[in-house]
Each structure stands twice: as structure tokens, then as C-alpha cells.
UniProtKB/Swiss-Prot annotation:
It comes from Salmonella enteritidis PT4 (strain P125109). GO terms for cellular component: cytoplasm. Involved in the degradation of chitin. ChbG is essential for growth on the acetylated chitooligosaccharides chitobiose and chitotriose but is dispensable for growth on cellobiose and chitosan dimer, the deacetylated form of chitobiose. Deacetylation of chitobiose-6-P and chitotriose-6-P is necessary for both the activation of the chb promoter by the regulatory protein ChbR and the hydrolysis of phosphorylated beta-glucosides by the phospho-beta-glucosidase ChbF. This is Chitooligosaccharide deacetylase. It comes from the Bacteria.
Amino acid sequence: MERVLIVNADDFGLSKGQNYGIVEAYRNGVVTSTTALVNGEAIDHAAQLSRELPALGVGMHFVLTLGKPVSEMPGLTRDGLLGKWIWQMAEEDTLPLDEIAHELACQYQRFIDVFGREPTHLDSHHHVHMFPQIFPIVAHFAAQRGIALRIDRQTVLNADDLPSDLRSTQGFSSEFYGEEITEACFLRILDASAHRGEASLEVMCHPAFVDNIIRQSAYCYPRLTELEVLTSASLKAAIAERGYRPGCFLDI
């Protein structure tokens, strides 16, 4: 059975170092897709690079935890900025869902304005779209527009919650992250997916060159390690040996 493998690099547009790392991992490695933060400091730079790489799938990385929102969000921001207090608000069930739905539409339009095309798919920074309160908003938004959505099926409590016409990969892994970033780790993800019989798999990654913006991230130098592994010739060969076909979300 042929399996489609999407290796999606998150955080396109976060910084120039992030952008260059993603492009390097696409040109000389196994990355096939990326998702862009439209409020990132280097989003225009990301869009410029993407025009030179028309085969690179570019989706939208919905942001509710970093930087300035595109629209006014008084119910979620503090001093005009987004932040990680969204987790506490989710636990307290005090999320401003109308503001979030409006911000999603505004970020989507901003993506189209910057990239000149619709995104191939949607996911989110820090996986906030998988919050139980937010997921239905994003899932129906994606389904209405006919674009795919990253779904962590271990988080979705009920498959009936998914719109029938929503596209996604059968499998998703965020395990290529943290302290153990190795070729063996990546291949274990593929083998586990194949064992489950999944015909399509998305693996999340964050390859980057370190710059001043990346240094401010709690997840900094492992991004360099990711880049090294993802551009390994032996990894590309091992993926091919396992019968995976590189693809993007337009292929599912």
C-alpha cells in the first residue's frame, strides 16, 4: 500500500532564521509542507521565499498565543498582545469564542493578502485549535472552505464531532520534538503509523537556523538538530524504503 507522508514545518514567518531553515529542509531534506504565522515578524519574507518554491505546500498556522492579533481581541489579549494565559481561560471556560472565530477569518484573509492564494490547510501555534471549545470553530471553518486541517485524533473525543467533508491525514505525530530528535525517532513514528494501517501521515517539525528571535524561544537549539536530521540523506532513503510518497495536504 502506498502511503502519503507530509512532513510539515511549523512557524513559517516567525523569523528569517526559521524561514531559511524551513526552506533548507525542503530543498535538501524531507520537509514537504509548512504553515505560516500571519502575525510573525518575518511573514513577508516567508511569502517572498514561497514564491520561489511553488511546489512547497503552505498552510496557515492559526495564532492565539503569540504577538499581536490581526483583529481587536479585548477578551483574549493583555496590553494588546496574545499569550499563554489562553490555557487558563480554556480551563475556566471563559474563552471569547466570537472573538476567536472572527480572528480566524481575519488571519485567513491576511494569509490570502500576503501569499496571494489560499492556504493548503490549517493548524495552529501550540495546538490551540484542538481545545474542545475552539476545535468545532476551526473544523467547520476548514470544511466550509474545502481545505484540510491538522487533527490530533487522540485529542478528538468523538469522531462524530468532525464535519463529514473535512479533510485530514489519517495519522498525525508531534513526537519529533524535544530532547530526542534523531533519525531513529523519526522512523519509529513512520513504523508505528504503518502498523496502524494509516494511508496518510503528517509529522510535525520546526527546523530553523538560530537568530535573535529564535533565541527568545523556549524551544531554540533543538530546531538546529531537527534541521540536521531532516536534511540527512540516510533519512530520505529510509523513508523511500518504507514505501512512503512525499506529499502535501493537496494530495489527500
